[in-house]
C-alpha cells in the first residue's frame, strides 16, 4: 500500500501542504481552528506559541504561513493528542521548526525564558455540564483544566510587548472573554465576527489582544454566499489550505 493511500485512509483531514490525523484527539479538525489558523496576524513574527495544540493543526498552519526562520512551540496537556500532533508534524515539511511539548501550560510557562510574538489558542469554552464520554473529550470541551483567567495570565507572562494573543470563541462567550481580558490589562486590537451567511447573526468571533494599546480594527466575515458556496472573503482567507478550493 502506498504512503498516500495509507494516509488518506486514516481518520483525518487532508490540506494542500499537509495532513492532520485526529483520530486520537478529543476535538477534531473543524472550521473554528481553520479560521483561526488562517486569520491570525503573522507579519514579522519570530516565535509562536500554540496553547492546547490538540492535533497540531494551528501549529502547522502557522508554519505554512511563516518564514523558515520562525520557531513554533506547541503545548498540549493530553498525552495521546500530543503524540498524534508530533506524528502529524513529523510528516509535514516543517518538522524541524515545530516543537511539541506534552505539558501543563501553566507549569511549562514558568520554565521559559523566551517571549512570543504570536500566541494562538482554540480554547475550551463550556462550563462543566453533561459528562463526556472520555476524560480527554471533557478536557477539550470544558474549562476545567485551564479556565479563561488562567489562559490570559499564561499568555501575558510570555508575550512580547507588541505581540498578539489570538483566540476563536462563540460570539457571546467571546464578548465575555473580551471584558475579562480588558480588565486584566489586555488591549483588543483585532476582531472579526463570523456568520454562516448574510442572513444569520455571527456565531463565532476571532479576537486578537495585545499588551500594547492601539486602534482596534473590526470586521465581519460571512462563510457562505447566497448560492451556498464559500464566499469570496472566506475563500481568500482559507484557499491556501483547503485541498479543493
From Swiss-Prot:
The protein's name in its UniProt record: tRNA1(Val) (adenine(37)-N6)-methyltransferase
First-listed, main subcellular location of the protein, grouped into a coarse class: cytoplasm
CDD domains: AdoMet_MTases (cd02440)
Disulphide-bridged cysteine pairs: none
EC number of the protein: 2.1.1.223
Gene3D superfamilies linked: Vaccinia Virus protein VP39 (3.40.50.150)
Chain's role: Specifically methylates the adenine in position 37 of tRNA(1)(Val) (anticodon cmo5UAC).
GO cellular component terms, semicolon-separated: cytoplasm
Reaction(s) the record says it catalyses: adenosine(37) in tRNA1(Val) + S-adenosyl-L-methionine = N(6)-methyladenosine(37) in tRNA1(Val) + S-adenosyl-L-homocysteine + H(+)
GO biological processes: methylation; tRNA processing
GO MF entries: nucleic acid binding; tRNA (adenine-N6)-methyltransferase activity
InterPro entries: DNA_methylase_N6_adenine_CS (IPR002052), SAM-dependent_MTases_sf (IPR029063), Small_mtfrase_dom (IPR007848), tRNA_Adenine-N(6)_MTase (IPR050210), tRNA_adenine-N6_MeTrfase (IPR022882)
Enzyme class, UniProt record, top EC level: transferase
Keywords noted in UniProt: Cytoplasm, Methyltransferase, S-adenosyl-L-methionine, Transferase, tRNA processing
Family: Belongs to the methyltransferase superfamily. tRNA (adenine-N(6)-)-methyltransferase family.
Encoding gene per record: yfiC
HAMAP family in the cross-refs: tRNA_methyltr_YfiC (MF_01872)
Location of this chain's protein in the cell: Cytoplasm
Matches recorded under NCBIfam families: tRm6a37MtseTrmN (NF047853)
Amino acid at each position: 500500500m502506498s504512503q498516500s493511500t495509507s494516509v488518506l485512509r486514516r481518520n483525518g483531514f487532508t490540506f494542500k501542504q499537509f495532513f492532520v490525523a485526529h483520530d486520537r484527539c478529543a476535538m477534531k479538525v473543524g472550521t473554528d481552528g481553520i479560521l483561526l489558523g488562517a486569520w491570525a496576524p503573522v507579519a514579522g513574527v519570530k516565535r509562536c506559541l500554540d496553547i492546547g495544540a490538540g492535533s497540531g493543526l494551528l501549529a502547522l498552519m502557522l508554519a505554512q504561513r511563516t518564514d523558515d526562520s520562525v520557531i513554533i512551540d506547541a503545548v498540549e496537556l493530553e498525552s495521546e493528542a500530543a503524540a498524534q500532533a508530533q506524528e502529524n508534524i513529523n510528516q509535514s515539511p516543517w518538522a524541524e521548526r515545530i516543537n511539541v511539548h506534552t505539558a501543563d501550560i501553566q507549569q511549562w510557562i514558568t520554565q521559559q525564558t523566551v517571549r512570543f510574538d504570536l500566541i494562538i489558542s482554540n480554547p475550551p469554552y463550556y462550563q462543566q455540564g453533561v459528562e463526556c464520554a472520555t476524560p480527554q473529550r471533557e478536557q477539550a470541551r470544558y474549562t476545567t483544566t485551564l479556565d479563561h483567567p488562567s489562559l490570559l495570565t499564561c499568555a501575558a507572562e510570555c508575550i512580547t510587548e507588541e505581540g498578539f494573543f489570538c483566540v476563536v470563541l462563540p460570539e457571546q462567550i467571546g464578548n465575555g472573554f473580551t471584558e475579562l481580558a480588558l480588565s486584566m490589562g489586555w488591549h483588543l486590537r483585532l476582531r472579526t465576527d463570523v456568520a454562516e451567511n448574510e442572513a444569520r447573526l455571527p456565531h463565532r468571533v476571532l479576537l486578537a489582544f495585545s499588551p500594547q494599546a492601539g486602534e482596534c480594527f473590526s470586521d465581519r466575515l460571512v462563510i457562505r454566499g447566497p448560492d451556498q458556496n464559500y464566499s469570496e472573503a472566506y475563500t481568500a482567507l482559507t484557499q491556501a489550505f483547503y485541498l479543493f478550493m
